[in-house]
Amino acid sequence: WDGITDPMIGITRCVEYALNHFGIQANDLRELCPFIGPPLLDSFRDFYHFTDEQAKIATEKYRERFADTGIYENKLYDGMKDFLEEAIQQGHILMLATSKPTVFAKRILDYFDIARYFTFVAGSGLDGSFYTKGDVIRHVLESNNLTDHPSVVMIGDRKHDIIGAKENRLDSIGVLYGYGDR
């Protein structure tokens, strides 16, 4: 699962902070919304044509702000807590697969008091491991011995969630309340 909180303010302000390090000014935080979802290194390279080294530095600057401030600049989507509760009551097992580093994902779940709904939380590694959404989903499946997964479904609000599910031969549900589109 991914797409539980609206991270727009936190992510875009952290991207803005990283860009400022390079003397780049963003005119409007909404211009930075494409950074929501894909790996940061890719986004800095793709959208600002950063070299690998510049993208690495930008990611470090991003995380510098995110760790203390940006992590809390997001909000739970309306009705999400009730939805999670209902899913658990119906017997579903929920696991989180996010592009955010695992350490940040766990802090966000704790902050919103929803960690108890998830039996497993996985994200990218601060060391660059589990780089793509497909890598993260594969890690979730392997760590939980889910080798035969006809009842496993990836729910997400970005194309990267759906692509990652397909890479792992999972069914997926794309939701439109977040930052995805058709």
What are the language-model segments listed below?
Residues 115-130:
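A short, structured active-site edge motif that brings together acidic residues
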Residues 1-34, 48:
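Active-site neighborhood of HAD-like aspartate-dependent phosphohydrolases
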